[in-house]
From Swiss-Prot:
GO term, biological process aspect, one: nucleotide-excision repair
Lineage of producing organism: Bacteria, Pseudomonadati, Thermodesulfobacteriota, Desulfovibrionia, Desulfovibrionales
Free-text function comment from the UniProt entry: The UvrABC repair system catalyzes the recognition and processing of DNA lesions. UvrC both incises the 5' and 3' sides of the lesion. The N-terminal half is responsible for the 3' incision and the C-terminal half is responsible for the 5' incision.
Name recorded for this polypeptide: UvrABC system protein C
Source species: Lawsonia intracellularis (strain PHE/MN1-00)
TM stretches of this protein: none
UniProt keyword list: Cytoplasm, DNA damage, DNA excision, DNA repair, Excision nuclease, SOS response
Amino acid sequence: MERPHPSSIPTTPGVYLYKDSQGRIIYVGKARNLRKRVLSYFRDGLVITPKTKAMMNHANLLETISTNTEKEALLLEASLIKKHRPRYNIVLRDDKQYLLFRIQKGIPFPRLEIVRQSYKDNAVYFGPFTSGTSVRDTWKFIHKIFPLRRCSDKVFNNRIRPCLYFYLQQCLAPCTEEVDPKDYAVLIQKVELFLSGKSKELVELLQKDMLYASEALEFEKAATLRDQIQAIKHTIERQSVVLPEGGDMDVIGIAVVNNGLALGFLFVREGKLLDGRTFFWPGLELDDGPELLGSFLSQFYSPISSIPPRIIVPWLPESTNNKDEISEDTFETLKYVLEDIRNSTVRIEVPKNIIESNLVDIAVTNAREAVQTKLGEPMSAKLAKVFHTDKPIFRIECVDVSHISGTNTRVGMVVFEDSQPLKNDYRIYSTTEDNSPFIKGDDYAALASWAKRRIQSGPPWADLVLIDGGKGQINAVQRVFNEHHLKDVFILAGIAKARNEEGRVDRRAGNIGDKIFVVGRMNPLTLKEGSPELLFLQYVRDTAHNFVLGKHRKARKNTALLGELLRIPGIGQATAKLLWSHFKTVEAMTCATIKDLEAIPGIGEAKARMLAERLQSLRNQ
């Protein structure tokens, strides 16, 4: 790529995008001064990392986006990296949100919820946690010793008698006012102490309550409190205290492992090591460490994150003009962004004492051991060998078609990155939306319709597009891709199901009868029976099949319910549309109360009573 003329680049803060010859974004960067940063790439004698050198060799086009401040540039950079996943950026591949406990404030009888997002609402959050199993086990443990309500708000507001948990002495039945709000508030206070890690204060409080109960001759209550104390003490014994003085912080360690960089992340809350996580980026060197650290922090934390007051990092960057390093100015900007999210002070700093240094060492050790344990040859490299390509097959988009006797045709697409499902990118396509009446029962036309709409969505493109089908299906898709000059952007393949002697589909895992067809190849690929590559491709195919089938069943159920609605006297198309637009799902509609129905404009009290009765009968069918 030729050096751009300085006058073509603004001197404002902003984001710059390098694109390849096909227009794909291959790198996104941010700068306080766009002209100064971009021109630095073309300075003679500049020492750059191999990754940056490779990026410049592939770059064909430069675009810039100006922002008002460097903070805005940092946020835009993180957003573009998450959206486009450029090849030469350090991308945080794990987009899933961590789990949190949530307790709503301002209501008399809140429940303990498990959520993936936190908001600036009238609630308190505890976490984060990475393991769904451990979170659910903790939730069960809390309900076992603290009898909170478990039901949803809708069930709670409509219950007229206590549930089974009340009779098992695992719920105080606030739904039927069996407990005073003040007593329930005390219970919530104890749960908050437990989740905050303040177990010592909680035990002292319970011991006082037990003493008062004994003095009042309430021996059954005292026995319950005794059991709670014993259960909590047993839990405390298993917790690892890493900060004797307490405190909340996240700790990061970075290690060079197996020709790549591994990052270990520890969650420390109330002085206790709550949880941990490891990440790995192959192909990075130690010189990429500063960029990795800055990219990770800007992508990992978001407006729905749980951000502690301190983030301990292995090093802080020095002020530098080398564009391959993240400068202290960038860290300062990142600090301001995190403080805006947290609405309080955030310090990004190196360890201050031997205890914190040891925590960084633990994070490094965890990262190194996790990578060495899990890392054989990655599946992306194995699949590259299967499909005879030099480029690792990192992103896979798999497509399947479902219909019933040619009606309600749906095309489902699932996405895998780094061998993991990327559920936020799953999509369902209703092929009737492009006004193609000939599609009924025609899988080829449905797939062609999907291909057109997938192209309209744009990048990020897959390394492998996998179709649930054979040569006919992949040829239908290939024609569309060729028309839009996308022939060489990705590999297009089909996986055809094996069939038994009776001609029926045989879905046995690893079955060698499953054939994998590739565009441009006459014969199917030969994969060893039961090989990891074949098992993985079958798993991806089956995931797509189950996804579209589940959506199709839901659509059929909704269609059936619509027919039932129209058969109810007094309900026409207009009322049916009102119900659909208000409730969105079958479950919500059939659980609607008279009060819920009356709230819909155009439905009066008499009609609401009639609808509630009929919808209830539909739910019981």
